[in-house]
From Swiss-Prot:
Protein name per the record: Large ribosomal subunit protein bL17
Gene, per the UniProt record: rplQ
Keywords: Ribonucleoprotein, Ribosomal protein
GO BP, one annotated term: translation
PROSITE patterns documented for this protein: RIBOSOMAL_L17
Native source organism of the sequence: Thermoanaerobacter pseudethanolicus (strain ATCC 33223 / 39E)
Amino acid sequence: MGYRKLGRPSDQRRAMLRNLVTDFLKYGRITTTEARAKEVRSISEKMITLGKRGDLHARRQALAYILDESVVKKLFDEIAPKYKDRQGGYTRILKLGPRRGDGAPLVIIELV
């Protein structure tokens, strides 16, 4: 599968996505651009699947990507058990319309 470049060098893109995924799992919903939200959805769904696995290796893999240890704890103890009977599709993207400054399409991404 391909990926979006999001107009940044790879190190900046990775850092931005790690921050977005961490905040998304921390707060349960964030407002961002559509392209970023689609990337965040892909990564966060994989993180929730790791949380459902629940073993030590899965926890360490999540810690390698998510910046805040308390968010990993929340992922494994609160978020993942909520989706134990669901096979993917843990997130929802709602369109908001264009951003005032540059017209970029804004969306809300939230946990279902």
